[in-house]
Amino acid sequence: MYPKDKKTYEKLMDCAEKIFAEKGYDKASVREITSAANVNLASIHYHFGSKENLLQELLNRKLEWLNQQRLVALKNLESKSKNKPLKPSQILEAFFGTLLDMLDEKNYGGEMFLRLLGRSTLEPNCLISSISSGKNNAVTEKFRDALFKALPNVPKNEIVWRFHFMVGATSY
């Protein structure tokens, strides 16, 4: 979505991220977000159409960046390996290390976004789950495929469950 007024758009995104992380999506109100951003109450509707679209835009922007970092890390490892299977630890570092790297991204608001992701896992919301699943599925699949190659003697369903457990554990 292209912002109509970049300054107001960014203020809304920043305040919404903070409030969603602190209170959760369901308990955050449009009035509270616009008040924190010090903008007109109608600003969310003007820029995003709805609170739901605001959340979607926020998650899309952050997840696209995070997943791009993950794919770059995996691609770099694969190009260095010269078609040999990667070590499982390398694959996991590429996937989960990007989350830790995001904490250092002060200009990208990594810490607040990770709090939002953690909160969304603790307080499941169908909307948040569907947005993040849609953005993460293709990336997660690439990492699982890399783990399948790295661990050919481990049943695929066991790898899938272990990976799923690790993803869940990062939220707690």
Feature locations, PLM:
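Helix-turn-helix
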Residues: 11, 19, 23-61
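Hydrophobic alpha-helical connector segments
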Residues: 72-111
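An amphipathic alpha-helix adjacent to DNA-recognition modules
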Residues: 9-14, 48-71, 75, 85
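Amphipathic alpha-helical packing segments from all-alpha helical-bundle domains
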Residues: 90, 108-112, 125-151
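Hydrophobic alpha-helical segments that form the core
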Residues: 112-122, 156-172
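N-terminal intrinsically disordered/low-complexity leader segments
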Residues: 1-7, 78
